[in-house]
Curated annotation (Swiss-Prot):
Protein name: Cytidylate kinase
Organism in which the protein naturally occurs: Vibrio cholerae serotype O1 (strain ATCC 39315 / El Tor Inaba N16961)
Record gene name: cmk
GO biological processes: nucleobase-containing small molecule interconversion; pyrimidine nucleotide metabolic process
Family matches, as InterPro entries: Cytidylate_kin, Cytidylate_kinase_dom, P-loop_NTPase
GO MF term list: (d)CMP kinase activity; ATP binding; CMP kinase activity; dCMP kinase activity
Reactions listed under catalytic activity: CMP + ATP = CDP + ADP; dCMP + ATP = dCDP + ADP
């Protein structure tokens, strides 16, 4: 990581609002954006496009090393551009998710993608969205944020999103799913979900997105002086 490129990391559990916060911060700061949660799906999609064996580390490592991907904040969405093509919709397909699970299980591929993620830290600055950005990927980042919210609030937000899409979902089932995922993420052996020691912990449970952005920007500006 170049010492001339400021890095802002935003970690936290699923549903805390990391994606929205990172998109807005990248726009306001004029920084590049890294959505680490999508990176394995992007690699899997590149492998599918190029006919690369999803279980061959020898074939996947060079692809991961030179992965041509950009994350662009546009409107209310983050567009994912792979080799010049908008693949945002393709990334959400079940086939892509299944392929991502295969490539994520390969240690050398994970190492190559770690290096590729670190290479995003170039130019005017970077906002990195993930779960271990401040602890593993960018431990020397200038500004680290851990965005949290209660499991109940995260379930409520997700419930509202799904209802707006016309989907019939049960709140209790969503809450249970989020609590189980939290437990897995916080207790896994490799890179457990936790705030970096020098991170600002922001609890968004009772805050609006504007309030979260305002607090985050004040903190970032104090760190990037």
């Amino acid at each position: 990581m170049s010492s001339h490129t400021p890095v802002v990391t935003v970690d936290g559990p699923s549903g805390a609002g990391k994606g929205t916060l990172c998109m807005l911060l990248a726009k306001k700061l004029g920084f590049q954006l890294l959505d680490s949660g999508a990176i394995y799906r992007v690699l899997a999609l590149a492998a599918l496009h190029h006919g690369v064996d999803l279980e061959s580390e020898d074939a996947l490592v060079p692809l991961a090393t030179h992965l041509d991907v950009q994350f662009i904040a546009e409107g209310d969405l983050v567009k994912v551009i792979l080799e010049g093509e908008d693949v945002s919709r393709e990334l959400r397909k079940e086939e892509t998710g299944m392929a991502a699970s295969k490539v994520a299980a390969l240690p050398r591929v994970r190492e190559a993608l770690l290096r590729r993620q670190r290479a995003f830290a170039s130019g005017i600055g970077l906002v990195a969205d993930g779960r271990d950005m401040g602890t593993v990927v960018f431990p020397a980042a200038e500004a680290k944020i851990f965005l949290d919210a209660s499991a109940e609030e995260r379930a409520r937000r997700r419930f509202k999103q799904l209802q707006l899409k016309g989907l019939d979902v049960k709140f209790d089932a969503l809450l249970s799913e989020i609590q189980e995922r939290d437990d897995r993420d916080r207790n896994r052996a490799v890179a457990p979900l936790r705030p970096a020691e020098d991170a600002l912990v922001l609890d968004s449970t009772t805050l609006t997105i504007d309030e979260v952005v305002e607090q985050a920007l004040q903190y970032i500006e104090s760190k990037l002086v």
